[in-house]
């Protein structure tokens, strides 16, 4: 009996000019996702995924590194213009937004805060006592 040949499909990368950078800055981590205009993910990165552990994940420097990593991956797909959507109260939020504008060859078109605000919904967690 003859053996079957395994045929590998070639990976076709689409050239995408415009995209959206979603920055989710929580108290413990910062996640960055680059999508096309339809919302399909192109590249992503997070502070924890880059090797920052524990309390170092929530630092502004870790957020900056996560943004640079995600945008460098997205540049391979031909991204030239991005809009920024920021969510969450984290400490890396401002630094992440600034570092998107600092990346070479990428133009920022808009900046929007999409943090969900409760209209007297769920009761918030109790205050910490240290």
UniProtKB/Swiss-Prot annotation:
InterPro entries: Ribosomal_uS11, Ribosomal_uS11_bac-type, Ribosomal_uS11_CS, Ribosomal_uS11_sf
A GO CC annotation given for this chain: ribonucleoprotein complex
GO biological process: translation
Keyword RNA-binding among record annotations: yes
Protein keywords: Ribonucleoprotein, Ribosomal protein, RNA-binding, rRNA-binding
A Pfam family annotated for this UniProt entry: Ribosomal_S11
Gene3D superfamilies: Ribosomal protein S11 (3.30.420.80)
GO molecular function: rRNA binding; structural constituent of ribosome
PANTHER family in alphabetical order: 40S RIBOSOMAL PROTEIN S14/30S RIBOSOMAL PROTEIN S11
Function according to Swiss-Prot or TrEMBL: Located on the platform of the 30S subunit, it bridges several disparate RNA helices of the 16S rRNA. Forms part of the Shine-Dalgarno cleft in the 70S ribosome.
Sequence similarity: Belongs to the universal ribosomal protein uS11 family.
Assembly with partners or alone: Part of the 30S ribosomal subunit. Interacts with proteins S7 and S18. Binds to IF-3.
HAMAP family: Ribosomal_uS11
Protein name (Swiss-Prot/TrEMBL): Small ribosomal subunit protein uS11
Species this protein is from: Campylobacter curvus (strain 525.92)
Taxonomic lineage from the root: Bacteria, Pseudomonadati, Campylobacterota, Epsilonproteobacteria, Campylobacterales
């Amino acid at each position: 009996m003859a053996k079957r040949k395994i045929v590998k499909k070639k990976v076709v990368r689409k050239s995408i000019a415009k995209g959206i950078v979603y920055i989710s800055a929580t108290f413990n981590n910062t996640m960055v996702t680059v999508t096309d205009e339809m919302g399909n993910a192109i590249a992503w990165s997070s502070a924890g995924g880059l090797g920052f552990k524990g309390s170092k994940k929530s630092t502004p420097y870790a957020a900056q590194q996560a943004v640079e990593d995600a945008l460098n991956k997205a540049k391979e797909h031909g991204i030239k213009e991005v809009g920024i959507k920021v969510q969450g109260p984290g400490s890396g939020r401002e630094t992440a937004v600034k570092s998107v504008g600092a990346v070479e060859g990428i133009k920022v078109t808009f900046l929007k805060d999409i943090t969900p605000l409760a209209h007297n919904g769920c009761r918030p967690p109790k205050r910490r006592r240290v």
